[in-house]
Curated annotation (Swiss-Prot):
GO terms for molecular function: small ribosomal subunit rRNA binding; structural constituent of ribosome. The gene is RpS13. This is Small ribosomal subunit protein uS15. It comes from the Eukaryota. Keywords: Ribonucleoprotein, Ribosomal protein. Pfam families: Ribosomal_S13_N (PF08069), Ribosomal_S15 (PF00312). GO terms for biological process: translation. One of its GO terms (cellular component) is nucleolus. Belongs to the universal ribosomal protein uS15 family. PANTHER family: RIBOSOMAL PROTEIN S15P/S13E (PTHR11885), SMALL RIBOSOMAL SUBUNIT PROTEIN US15 (PTHR11885:SF6).
Length: 151
């Protein structure tokens, strides 16, 4: 996938396995996977972190193939859905860290420019999530209150 603020076209992509059935060697049932997701979600992990742990520690390649639902949908059903989507959260976190850096290094012009790019990505993603009703329509990103969102 190509980058938004870079000249490269991007040819890298991941390929899902063709077989969509559960492997015969996998000992976890759908209910066990759901319990693991619930347990890891209560610890405060993001859906992608949960997926990585399930893949590396338990051998679950795709939660959707085992359970029929994605990690985020399972978390939503249990009531552990994050307040703001994961990708937006990490963009806000990055913007907050760059702002903190700029307080100490006022003359860092490149960081100022990168902050503008990151904040434009935040606004674009927030607009998308408002349309999809993931965020409330009155949600607004403000740099002054952003550190409270990611704390």
């Amino acid at each position: 996938m190509g980058r938004m603020h870079a000249p490269g076209k991007g040819i890298s992509k991941s390929a899902l396995p063709y077989r969509r059935s559960v492997p015969s060697w996998l000992k976890l049932s759908a209910e066990d996977v759901k319990e693991q997701i619930k347990k890891l979600g209560k610890k405060g992990m993001t859906p992608s972190q949960i997926g990585i742990i399930l893949r590396d520690s338990h051998g679950v390649a795709q939660v959707r193939f085992v359970n029929g639902n994605k990690v985020l949908r399972i978390m939503k059903a249990v009531g552990l859905k994050p307040d703001i989507p994961e990708d937006l959260y990490f963009l806000i976190k990055k913007a907050v860290s760059i702002r903190k850096h700029l307080e100490r290094n006022r003359k860092d012009i490149d960081s100022k420019f990168r902050l503008i790019l990151i904040e434009s990505r935040i606004h674009r993603l927030a607009r998308y999530y408002k349309i999809k009703a993931v965020l409330p329509p009155n949600w607004k990103y403000e740099s002054s209150t952003a550190s409270a969102l990611v704390a």
